[in-house]
Amino acid sequence: MKLYLCIACCLLSLISSSQKVVDVDKTSGTAGNLFYAVGGEPYVNVKFVRLVSGSPYFKDQWMKGAATSAAGILFKSGIVKLDIMDNEVHFLDVAEKEMIVGLPLKDITLTDTLTGKSYHFVNTTYGFNYPSVKKGWYLQAASGAAGLYQYFIKQLRENRPFNSATTEQTIVTLEEFYILYKSNLVRVKKPKDVPLILSDKKAELEVYLKKLDAQKASNSEQLVALVTYYNSLLE
């Protein structure tokens, strides 16, 4: 009888030690390793073993990360990467093994430790849900009364070089921009579209756009500058 009791106690001890409970009331804004507590799955790179150029990630280097779950819980993770192609967040566990976050995330902020620059991404499935918009991670390029979001499209292309038995893979990155204004998310294809979308300041934006054209700024730079300028007019 004593033997059975000992076995039962051992089993209960093993079960208890294998479970990791996160106190929801105490997690917001605190510990740095909470992704470990909620678990994930190991990352196995079998998809891009023949990749010669391009990347499925927003940036290849590991960055500091902080994320909000779909349930509204703030998680601060140590080191993460954002996989744009598969809409996954990768992190390093305590043994520095690459893992995939297993819980739905609403948004994530990546910080480059070398430059100090931060990148805030919103998941359209949980952050703001618009039926006509492609699902995935959108980079917030400007915020305020009008928001500007950048959407990256990763396309995998395969090519077999002449006299080669191996097929090479290339990932090409395309991008789209969207303006969030008065609860409407509208795609903007060129800077000239911005004054038409943010029409209450149309005249001011058109004058500012001419200045940007004279400076020969890129389309993406002009879009960010125009939306930022619009928001400053409302302050």
Regions picked out by a protein language model, each given a short descriptive name:
Residues 24-27, 32, 190, 218-222:
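Intrinsic-disorder/low-complexity, polar/charged segments
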Residues 3, 18-77:
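General N-terminal leader/first-domain-start detector
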Residues 60, 65-192:
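Aromatic-patch recognition
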Residues 1-23, 226:
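Bacterial Sec-dependent N-terminal signal peptides
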Residues 196-235:
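Long, compositionally biased interface segments
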